[in-house]
Amino acid sequence: MNFLWEVENPTVTTMPLNVSFANRNYDLDYDSVQPYFICDEEENFYHQQQQSELQPPAPSEDIWKKFELLPTPPLSPSRRSGLCSPSYVAVATSFSPREDDDGGGGNFSTADQLEMMTELLGGDMVNQSFICDPDDETFIKNIIIQDCMWSGFSAAAKLVSEKLASYQAARKDSTSLSPARGHSVCSTSSLYLQDLTAAASECIDPSVVFPYPLNDSSSPKSCTSSDSTAFSSSSDSLLSSESSPRATPEPLVLHEETPPTTSSDSEEEQDDEEEIDVVSVEKRQPPAKRSESGSSPSRGHSKPPHSPLVLKRCHVSTHQHNYAAPPSTRKDYPAAKRAKLDSGRVLKQISNNRKCSSPRSSDTEENDKRRTHNVLERQRRNELKRSFFALRDQIPELENNEKAPKVVILKKATAYILSVQADEHKLISEKDLLRKRREQLKHKLEQLRNSGA
């Protein structure tokens, strides 16, 4: 019941083992374990549950206790001001060489310490949300990351105790078999292990966050649709917990890539869009090793140097619809008209591209053609104007009217033509009558001549 006593007395805190972590914020630690508080009657509650199995569960009943379920994958680390929890300080002190041993047989070699730290950080310990000191049983109950929806505390404690027993056995075996190392080597390895434990103590397993394997050619990005504030606060403290054993200690680099935004753009994004920080992992080769590999290309096929994991925070903007905004006044054109507008835009773009891609000679040719066309069009208009003036002069009613419009000229000209045609028909009929009269007079004159002879 040590864990329940710690939960009931949240004000009791453990002093940090390292002096460098003096700026600890205990209020945030209290907030991190607050979801695990349950009712005051734990013993009676579980005793009642064992006695009455057939009764329906109460609203505050821990129904998952009887199933002995494993905890779910851990949540993102909570917002903390410093990395100073006693659990990972205990881990750092337990795996670091001690001064009272004087570099004797009780210390690990550098390779063994790196391997054990890698197994501890990358194994099931992080997935079970516990990082404990093997020598101290009180740290078994110290919860670093735990989902409040699940409460498989007893099963997780059993697994942790079994894991710690195996680690203690491995420590004893390695203590009896490993040769004595120098104090300088142990001091350097202890400093590196302390930095590693301080950096990756409150981290989660990367296989949970990044389900895809890490390749040298591509670095897949895992995007989550969680709340932006929670994710940004957790991504500030998120570090990679994978490090290869027997590798040169190299620092983990964390940098942020966010595009610069102006004031107007930021105001618009606050209304319609929401920023999400996406953490991506990629492998980057140090510049020193890169220069060495570039200077000696003829050394043959050698093993590529170990490159550290680099965490990048990218800026991804997802559009969120603002339902409180007034409706837009943009008109929805029908499909046919929209297709016509799109086709017109495409044709305009094609013509612009042709104009831009055409050489200067084609531009001069087009200018010459346009100039000749303008001259011919001007000549045609002048001739048409002269013909209208001539037609106006032929009409008796519009002969002296210089401001007569073209429509009036055409109408009067049509009426005048019809009247002239009617006069022509009359004159033709009169001509025919006169010709007949002439024929008759000629025939009568010949008869008179014949009778007089």
From Swiss-Prot:
Polar residues bias spans: 349-361
Keywords: Acetylation, Activator, Chromosome, Cytoplasm, DNA-binding, Glycoprotein, Isopeptide bond, Nucleus, Phosphoprotein, Proto-oncogene, Transcription, Transcription regulation, Ubl conjugation
Domain of life of the native organism: Eukaryota
Short sequence motif named 9aaTAD, residue ranges: 115-123
Residue window of motif UBR5-degron: 369-378
Location of N6-acetyllysine modifications: 158, 163, 172, 289, 331, 337, 385
Keyword DNA-binding: yes
Gene Ontology terms: biological process: acinar cell proliferation; amino acid transport; B cell apoptotic process; branching involved in ureteric bud morphogenesis; cell population proliferation; cellular response to angiotensin; cellular response to arsenite(3-); cellular response to carbohydrate stimulus
Cross-link (Glycyl lysine isopeptide (Lys-Gly) (interchain with G-Cter in SUMO2)) at residue(s): 66, 158, 163, 312
Cross-referenced SMART domains: HLH (SM00353)
Glycosylation-annotated residues: 72
Domain bHLH: 368-420
General remark: Alternative translation initiation from an upstream, in-frame non-ATG (CTG) codon or a downstream ATG start site results in the production of 2 isoforms with distinct N-termini, shown in this entry as isoform 2 and isoform 1, respectively.
Functional summary from the UniProt entry: Transcription factor that binds DNA in a non-specific manner, yet also specifically recognizes the core sequence 5'-CAC[GA]TG-3'. Activates the transcription of growth-related genes. Binds to the VEGFA promoter, promoting VEGFA production and subsequent sprouting angiogenesis. Regulator of somatic reprogramming, controls self-renewal of embryonic stem cells. Functions with TAF6L to activate target gene expression through RNA polymerase II pause release.
Domain notes: The 9aaTAD motif is a transactivation domain present in a large number of yeast and animal transcription factors.
Name of the protein described by the UniProt record: Myc proto-oncogene protein
Organism (species): Rattus norvegicus (Rat)
